[in-house]
């Protein structure tokens, strides 16, 4: 081997190790950064009288999960909240823990390094800048409270004082009712605000909530084909108030299990081709959402 070639090889290995030490590793190398395709106001040309159930809407699974444990488990997204919104994401899957009376983003035991105050600030700024848009914000109590003397909902209410928040227990009927609003979907027990989505939520299956929201959330699978079949089945569901189709999954029949990065590598390229077959797409929640996902999602429906 020539000396020049050897130097290039050593430099390449060194660069890879630097990426690993910076916390990019497997997940970071897999994730694509957006080229900033702007879908920040894609709802502006949708008629006010369009029923909410008839609007195809992209979303992100575990919206704030940008960090992981050992670069293996925890991360589900590579784009910031602002980038996701500007790229067209309109369903946010926000998962929180109450700690010392403050709400912070977590994914399981992983601290996602974002306060709910900073999250709501960014969402409010986006909606005020883009009043043609609406957002559905699912809020899940991801972990039990610690060192707190108020309830999860008491804390939540303190962040939702702006009139942009739609906290009725009933879904808006039309886009007109929801424009410029953030519609709250409540995934925590004993909620008194927001559209209830805690009672009846089942683990790793497809189900219909009491308010006729259909959910496909089969995340424990043994093959990519199993997950693909579940996604297609949800596309074919008709007549529900809403339908929410999670693309997230991990395969349980291996060691270590395949987490979000490798599952997204299987599902995202496939869904970019498959989704064109369906006009009634409902709400589709992506892991590692990218510009190519959004271009494929909106093709033929905008």
Language-model-derived ranges and their functions:
Residues 116-163:
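Catalytic cores of phosphodiester-bond-cleaving enzymes
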Residues 159-276:
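Surface-exposed substrate-engagement region within the catalytic domains
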Residues 1-15:
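N-terminal Sec-pathway targeting helices
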Residues 22-91, 98-129, 134, 191-196, ...:
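Long, acidic (Asp/Glu-rich), low-complexity accessory segments flanking structured domains
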Residues 98, 141-143, 188-190:
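Active-site-proximal loop/turn and secondary-structure-junction residues that shape catalytic pockets
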Residues 156-177, 283-302:
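C-terminal domain-boundary segment and adjacent tail
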Residues 17-19:
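Hydrophobic core
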Residues 137, 184, 284:
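A residue-level signal for conserved active-site and pocket-lining positions in enzyme catalytic cores
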């Amino acid at each position: 081997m020539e000396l020049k070639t050897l130097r290039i090889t050593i430099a390449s290995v060194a660069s890879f190790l630097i990426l690993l030490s910076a916390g990019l590793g497997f997940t970071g190398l897999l994730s694509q950064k957006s080229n900033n395709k702007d879908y920040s106001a894609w709802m502006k040309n949708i008629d006010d009288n369009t029923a909410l159930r008839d609007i195809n809407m992209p979303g992100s699974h575990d919206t704030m999960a940008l960090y992981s444990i050992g670069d293996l488990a925890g991360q589900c997204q590579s784009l910031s909240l602002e980038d996701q919104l500007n790229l067209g994401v309109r369903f946010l899957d926000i998962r929180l823990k109450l700690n010392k009376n403050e709400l912070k983003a977590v994914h399981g035991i992983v601290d996602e390094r974002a306060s709910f105050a900073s999250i709501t600030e960014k969402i409010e700024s986006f909606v005020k800048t883009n009043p043609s848009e609406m957002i559905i914000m699912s809020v899940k109590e991801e972990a039990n409270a610690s060192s707190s003397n108020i309830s999860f909902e008491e804390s939540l209410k303190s962040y939702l004082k702006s009139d942009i928040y739609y906290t009725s227990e009933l879904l808006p009927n039309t886009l007109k009712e929801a424009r410029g609003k953030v519609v709250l979907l409540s995934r925590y027990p004993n909620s008194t605000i927001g559209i209830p989505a805690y009672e009846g939520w089942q683990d790793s299956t497809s189900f219909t909530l009491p308010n006729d929201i259909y959910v496909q959330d089969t995340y424990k699978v043994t093959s990519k084909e199993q997950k693909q079949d579940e996604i297609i089945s949800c596309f074919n569901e008709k007549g529900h108030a809403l339908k929410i189709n999670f693309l997230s999954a991990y395969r349980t029949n291996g060691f270590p299990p395949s987490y979000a990065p490798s599952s997204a590598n299987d599902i995202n390229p496939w869904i970019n081709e498959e989704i064109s077959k369906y006009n009634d797409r409902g709400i589709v929640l992506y892991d590692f959402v990218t510009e190519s996902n959004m271009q494929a999602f909106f093709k033929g429906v905008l």
